[in-house]
């Protein structure tokens, strides 16, 4: 609920291991809000979000360890270099086993910019960093809000290849403005107009 207005209601989702889905809606359709609720970054005014792993509920303060989230509005630390960002993330959310900093930088195709501050990156380069930090993180749930925002055609191909390589068996949900390239992996569709 936002002020006195319900942004969505009667949403009931059961996202099991390996769920692949997309939340579809135009601008202002609250896709981002629903993704934030699923991630537990936002608390719903009514209802609950339950997380379990191996049939045991995950405590609220530990859920962040199991979710990786990418969105164009998520801030990066402007004064950090790419290498510093990767090192910082590893302290609270490790990457998929076997991935070194050098390998992540190589997959990002930003090696010649690795010592440059993020504040000097273009919007497309920043989005690549956000995507790599989320997709290559060791998590059970991957949330992607408008993942191809700010990417040029080459960047969109890179996104698809990276996700195909590192999707694994985890659950993945994208929020999209009906752009097929963002949710090529989806087997399930949620249209927000059904819940408003």
Predicted ranges, named:
Residues 47-63:
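Conserved ABC transporter NBD signature motif
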Residues 8-10:
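Conserved structural motif at the start of ABC-family nucleotide-binding domains
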Residues 142-146:
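Catalytic Walker B motif of ABC-type/P-loop ATPase nucleotide-binding domains
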Residues 98-114:
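Conserved ABC ATPase "signature" region
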Residues 131:
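Hydrophobic anchor residue at the start of the ABC signature
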């Amino acid at each position: 609920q936002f002020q006195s207005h319900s942004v969505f209601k009667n949403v009931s989702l059961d996202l099991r291991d390996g769920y692949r889905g997309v939340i579809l809606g135009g601008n202002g359709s609250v896709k981002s809000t629903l993704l934030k609720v699923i991630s537990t970054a936002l608390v719903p005014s009514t209802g609950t979000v339950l997380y379990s792993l191996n049939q045991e509920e995950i405590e609220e303060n530990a859920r962040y360890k199991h979710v990786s989230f990418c969105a164009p509005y998520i801030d990066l630390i402007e004064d950090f270099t790419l290498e510093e960002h990767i090192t910082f993330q590893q302290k609270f959310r490790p990457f998929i086993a076997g991935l070194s900093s050098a390998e992540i930088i190589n997959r990002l195709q930003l090696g010649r910019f690795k010592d440059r501050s993020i504040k000097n990156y273009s919007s497309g380069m920043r989005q690549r960093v956000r995507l790599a930090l989320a997709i290559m993180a060791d998590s059970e749930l991957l949330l992607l809000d408008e993942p191809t925002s700010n990417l040029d055609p080459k960047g969109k191909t890179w996104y698809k290849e990276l996700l195909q390589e590192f999707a694994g068996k985890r659950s993945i949900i994208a929020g999209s403005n009906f752009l097929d390239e963002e949710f090529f992996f989806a087997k399930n569709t949620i249209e927000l107009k059904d819940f408003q």
